[in-house]
Amino acid sequence: MYHRNSAPPPPGWSGGYPPPQSQWPPHSYQYPPYPPQGPPPPPAHSYSPPPTYGNYPSPYSTPPPHSPSPYQHPQHGHSRSWTNPSLPPRPPRESQSFGKGAPSNYRFQYSECTGRRRALLIGINYIGQPNQLRGCINDVTNMSTFLHERFGYRREDMVILTDDQKNPMSVPTKINILRAMQWLVKDAQPNDSLFIHFSGHGGRTPDLDGDEEDGYDDVIYPVDYRVAGHIVDDEMHNIMVRPLQPGVRLTAIFDSCHSGTALDLPYVYSTQGILKEPNLAKEAAQDLFSALASYGKGDLSGVAMTAIGFLKKAAIGDSARQRTVMTKTSPADVVMFSGSKDTQTSADTFQDGEARGALSWAFIKSQKQRPNQSYLQLLNSIRAELEGKYTQKPQLSCSHPLDVNLLFVM
């Protein structure tokens, strides 16, 4: 997708490993000024900057009301889910130790997801622009209905940003997206359940703070990215993950290219439920092949440069992972399903008579067909829906070590 250069991302957070937060911290994020030469507003509207999130209208646009949700909050008289002991166990109420790789005595808290619910849904088709998409707005419509009917999210607690709306505050410009992200997490309390869904273009930009193993930050593109620039994963992490208290749940669905670590969550899990480590062995094999090719051509300097390059890459990759674990781990309960690995693109698909994003479609379908799955089961069922149709491989990542056999809740 796009790899447009824009203003450099914000400097990396150098505050070290964050302590668990007992109260809502002061937010240091400053709103960026809206570009003076932005895209023209929709007809019959004169754009004025949105108010601060304290007066944020919720929702920006409300879909037609549905019948009352059949969803009921689960009871917690036992550790198993609902009344069926064969279902995956619910998350434990006790605080959990981070274990290996984390500072001693540092703990996190799973969310029971029994408190307030809020959702931010962003769908951008980039109407009239190069590389226009077709299914992103449909994704938001379908996700809104699914959240309401399956998980009990109220329509009035959803903010929806799509680029087909006439209200300028409902258009997914960079400033609207950033302010909506702040609205999403404002005053969040333990056991609250927050949800963000982004369907649109994603890309990569050179990493400037050394926290990425591959040397690139993931970015998403607002509708006005040509003027306002992209939004970097470091920025999204600082706004939506860093302020959260222990026990607050944030579920993220990023259906975009190169979205594997779009929130900079340090714990990434395979379909076997194993915590992934950087694949330096594969890179070593690729670099060894290059070295042998140089040797065969008599290019000894090429052999030396390739060997030095691999050693440097391995050192940087290991250092980046340690930095991410030490600075991006959170005592909150943040879980993300992303449409593809950092190096992959995500696809539009055509399902049930309309264009959709592949991950958004698979996430909803797999849960409708089989409710009450574990995290690992859900990841594998999403992968199964896409297998053989697309090359992308959805990813599961978390802000803390995750017991992938627990019931997926949100």
Curated annotation (Swiss-Prot):
GO terms of biological process kind: apoptotic process; proteolysis
Q: Which family does it belong to?
A: Belongs to the peptidase C14B family.
Report the EC number(s), separated by commas if there are several. 3.4.22.-
Report residue spans for region: Disordered: 1-106
Tell me a Gene Ontology molecular-function term this record carries. Answer: cysteine-type endopeptidase activity
Source organism (scientific name): Aspergillus clavatus (strain ATCC 1007 / CBS 513.65 / DSM 816 / NCTC 3887 / NRRL 1 / QM 1276 / 107)
> Which residues of this protein are catalytic?
H201, C257
Do the record's keywords include Protease?
yes
Intrachain disulfide bonds: none
Enzyme type, top EC level? hydrolase
Q: Spell out the Pro residues composition-biased ranges.
A: 7-23, 32-52
Q: What does this protein do, in the record's words?
A: Involved in cell death (apoptosis).
Q: Which UniProt keywords apply?
A: Apoptosis, Hydrolase, Protease, Thiol protease, Zymogen
Q: Which domain of life is it from?
A: Eukaryota
CC annotations in GO: cytoplasm
What is the name listed in the Swiss-Prot or TrEMBL entry for this protein?
Answer: Metacaspase-1B
